[in-house]
Regions:
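Peripheral interaction segments used for macromolecular assembly
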Residues: 1-243
């Protein structure tokens, strides 16, 4: 089942021993279209730090209750490799982060999550002492330019093959694999236009210089795509319906 990313903003995040904050953003890979991290707003707990939670710590997006629970303690999160909130996430940092928790690198293998198709909920294991954190990393400080903020891309213009076709309003994410299967596009007027769903596989590229998503669809194809409707946020399990 698909989940609206927009509906998850502000959801509470919990550790094994207490709350840690709420969902602020999602970082996704714009090559494979998979969410790699939940960005947590921890308030005054860890100020100035970019706190990332891998789907390996959460498992499925849909959990009973109103809190997304991570299979981690607050101490584990606090002691995890730190990165300043304004810094890009480098592959070197990711290697250190994954090694700290003892999880397999998602960039090794052909699957969405490396050697596995889904981010299995895993208990962190103590890494082997002496194993270099940058064993599979590129040059230090080199950011992974394909890791993008969903909050930042929301609002980008959509450019079809024959002209402007609207703007990005939301993303639809698979609850088990965390793959972004569809983009929600607001067509026409920003206030009166309809919201349509197009496959992420139709995206040719994203230009971050001019805030535009380019797709291999025509404007007519976008306008004739399945219309997007969401159940009310108060529903027990917000189900997305295509009409």
């Amino acid at each position: 089942m698909s989940q609206s990313i927009k509906q998850l903003y502000g959801e509470k995040l919990g550790a094994l021993d207490g709350e840690i904050g709420h969902v602020k953003d999602f970082y996704f890979d714009d090559r494979s279209w998979v969410v790699r991290y939940v960005v947590a707003d921890t308030g005054n707990w860890l100020p100035g730090r970019l706190v990332l939670l891998s789907p390996h710590a959460i498992g499925s997006v849909y959990q009973d209750g109103k809190v997304l629970l991570a299979n981690l303690t607050r101490k584990q999160i606090e002691d995890s490799p730190a990165i300043e909130s304004h810094k890009p996430v480098s592959r070197q940092y990711e290697a250190e982060y994954y090694r700290y928790y003892g999880w397999p690198y998602y960039w090794l293998g052909d699957g969405l999550w490396g050697l596995s198709g889904f981010p299995i909920l895993e208990t962190p294991v103590k890494p082997f002492a002496g194993e270099p954190a940058n064993q599979v990393a590129p040059e230090p400080g080199n950011p992974d330019v394909h890791l993008r903020s969903a909050q930042a891309v929301k609002g980008y213009n959509l450019q079809a093959g024959d002209g402007a076709a609207g703007h990005v309003a939301d993303f639809m994410m698979n609850e088990e694999s965390w793959a972004i299967d569809e983009l929600v596009i607001k067509t026409g007027n920003r206030f009166t236009g309809k919201e349509m769903r197009i496959p992420s596989s139709s995206v040719k590229r994203i230009s971050y210089d001019d805030s535009t998503v380019y797709v291999n669809l025509t404007k007519e194809a976008v306008e004739q795509s399945p219309e997007h409707h969401l159940a009310s946020p108060g529903a027990a399990h917000a189900e997305c319906v295509i009409l």
